[in-house]
Each structure stands twice: as C-alpha cells, then as structure tokens.
Amino acid sequence: MAKRIITISREFGSGGRFIGEEVAKKLGIAYYDKNIISEIAEKSGLSPEYIQENAELSPKKGLLAYALAGRDITGKSVEDMVYEAQRKVILDLAEKGPCVIIGRNTDYILKDRDDVLNVFIHGDMPEKTQRIIRLYNVDEKEAVKMMADTDKRHMTNYNFYTDQKWGKASNYTLCLNSSQLGYDRCEKIIVECSK
C-alpha cells in the first residue's frame, strides 16, 4: 500500500527538517512543520507565540512541575490543551491529503492508519554538532548543549504523551542515519519507501 503521509521525527542537528522538506518537494505534496502553529493556537485558544515556544517541547519543566501545574475545570493542564489541539490539527491534516509532517508525536498520533510511513532521522554527534554550529552561529560547547537540551525535551514530551520511547526503532518504519547516508540518500530512501 502506498504511504500518502510521511512523518519525520528527528534528533536535533540531524537535518530531519531539511530532509522532510526536500521529500515533500520531490513528491509534490504538502509539508507541515512550524507552519501549523497558528492552527494549533486557534484550536487551543493560546497565542501562536506560546505554541511556538511550548507545543512540541512540553512538559518541559519535568513531571513534578507538570503535576503541580494549574488545570482547567476538566482537569487538563495548559500542556494537555496544547497537545490535544496539536493532535486534532494533525488528524485533520492527515485527512486533507498526502503530506510530510515534522515532529509533534505525529507517528504516534497517526499510528492506527495504514497509509503512514514513520521515519526517524538520527546522526552522529560530530556531524550534528558541526551542523548546529553552522546554522546557529554558536561555539561547539553551546551546540552540544543545544542538542542535549532539545533532544531531552523532545524525548520527555514523546515519552510522556505516547507511553513509548522516543527514538526506539520499533516505533518507526525507517530509522536513517543522515551522517552515514547523507541527506540525498535519506531523501531517496524515503521517497522510494512511500511508493
């Protein structure tokens, strides 16, 4: 069966976002990443700026802070409301047509669909570090810190909301090392596997 929806989860610095965008161009399908923030904000009633800062990375302050966080009348925290709005937007996008969606626990949210190709992009530390240094104009120490912090927040969010382990191979159809394969080959593999 052809896979009309491609989800891409990735380690920070692995080039997963770039690879996803190129795959969407090659297939001539929609690409969703940060461009869905306004839809999530609208569904949650929160500002796009708040969503930008928190949607994929909450509960960023840890489980104790999450447990002590304020809740609405239904018992949902702000993080839960953001996640629920994000889930609804992703389900709507999947119904609209073929697309590539980056991050946001999309592999888990769409797990019951047969037409989804779930991809995890990872890379080797030296290559990821150099990419972050180039893209963000930071030194090596800051690049390593950014990588560790971002991946930890992605992992915490994913593990919390999915009850699964972020980056675990069995959660994905494909796991690709962009450092060893290169971006172009990763793109070609994903395109081929989507057919």
Regions found by a protein language model. Give the residues of each.
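Pre-Walker A (Motif I) flank of P-loop NTPase domains
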Residues: 2-11, 97
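Glycine-rich phosphate-binding P-loop
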Residues: 8-21
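Short beta-strand-centered segment that lines the nucleotide-binding/catalytic pocket of NTP-utilizing
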Residues: 30-41
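ATP-dependent small-molecule kinase phosphotransfer cores
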Residues: 41-98
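Small-molecule kinase domains that catalyze NTP-dependent phosphoryl transfer to phosphate-bearing small molecules
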Residues: 59-66, 139-184
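Short, amphipathic alpha-helical "lid/cap" segments that border enzyme active or binding sites
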Residues: 87, 183-191
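RNA pseudouridine synthases
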Residues: 93, 106-112
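Conserved phosphate-donor/acceptor-positioning beta-strand/loop module used by diverse small-molecule
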Residues: 112-134, 140-148
